[in-house]
Amino acid sequence: MPALQPLSLSPADWWNHAVLYQIYPRSFADSNGDGIGDIPGIISKLPHIADLGVDALWLSPFYTSPQKDAGYDVADYCNVDPIFGSLSDAEKLIETAHEYGLRIIVDVVPNHSSDQHPWFQKALAAKPGSRERARYMFREGKGVAGDLPPNNWESVFGGPAWTRVAESDGSPGQWYLHLFDASQPDFDWKNPEVWELFRSVLTFWLDRGVDGFRVDVAHGVIKAEGLPDGEKLHHPPLGNNGPFWDQEGVHAVYQEWRKILESYGPDKMLCAEAWVMPLAKMAHYVRSDEMHQAFNFGYLATSFEAEALRSIINESLAAFGGVGSPSTWVLSNHDVVRHATRLGTDFVSQGQPTGIGPRSPEKPDALLGLRKARAASALMLALPGSAYLYQGEGLGLPEVIDIPDDRRKEPTFFRAHGERYGRDGCRVPIPWEAGAPAYGFNTTGESWLPQPQAFAELARDNQVGDPDSTLELYRSLLRFRNQQGLGKGSLVWLDGFSSDVVAFANGSVSVVSNTGEQPTARPDGEVLVTTTALGDEMIPAHTTVWIKTA
């Protein structure tokens, strides 16, 4: 295990080139054996994360919640749900992570709360037109008796985005908006009280030492004036140009938040989850007076094909560079099919939350998917800018496809009546020890989602010290990325390769990624990293190589 290296206060712009590791708390490590990961479990694994070589952690929500959407339905933004631990546990996590030189980013969910949030409970008990209802998007229905929704908006999880409430006398009443599950009512960001609520949330966690926030559904908090009908879509995506996404008013919210963070010093940061295309529009979220990072979902959604990769990299560098920001690269997270599976088939939706399951018409090629995923990760980590890793990808974990219907938890699966599988498959608890109960997730064998037998082979303890393992590949990639300053570097395209090859120089490192089916010539120089064994002077298919040229 690495020695403790207390967090340095510099550089202030650390996020420009950092590699951040996403932890989905309920699936990371379970200290009390109840089948759900928790904060003490995370603390116990901090030495392993530090040993991997990342710079910071992003934690998905651990706040008080009914867990209808795995914590993204928040009932109290300033407390910890008992299933994850206590507020003192969270404070200990922040302190201990800093002792290991790891910064901590936490989620903030500003678009909606839980329907169990005290504000919403008060709104249900109040009358139409009241101060309490004005904090949310309550509206009168259409039709003679108001029995039709106020507009035709659809939930991202399936079904209508409106639910009707019963008034205090039992009569059918107003409708409230929920772009996600009915248990997640949307705030009305035209209300100053909502602004004040989130000022207090940010300062609460900044006072406890967090280093920044990942902002959930950052592009959704402002809705179009008058709530007009949108285009009717069977599966409304998170990033379409509907009247509830990417409205101009969102930027004022984050301009204020930026000022709040800057009052705590120059090294606090905001990262946007904004499913906005083209990237030139996404880049608006990282202008100098707004956020510091925005996940590059255009890159995530790109196939492992040279022409497509060159195009999205060029577009990314131009779009984000145009506002003075590096790109924030990402391939997997808790909302999308893991890229070790996604790259093994042309069928799987790149976006969320469609998912893949046992009744999906095409089954991915697991070996091909892992081979491509290793190559894709090596390509991503060689690019200038910052990058995010999702727990388990450094073990080569695939999407878990064969989860029985009666074990699923995903709201999408139930709202879509099983037509869409959603995100359970990427959220299965990760394996630490091949021969332990629940593969080391805990000591009891309990697991809130079932783990496949294949996880034994992929467990961390099976990969430590194996030079061919995905874990050791990631450790090498992160070590050389840091040593060679690739995150702080710049990209120069290299000529002389076939159309199936992505090749560029970043400083003194040449990066060659063969996305095709045929071997390609390897440049001269010292091989720092290869994602597939090199037997001769050629680079095999679906392989990325880093070569030191000077």
Residue positions per predicted region:
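Active-site and adjacent substrate-binding regions of carbohydrate-active enzymes
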Residues: M1-E526, T530-A550
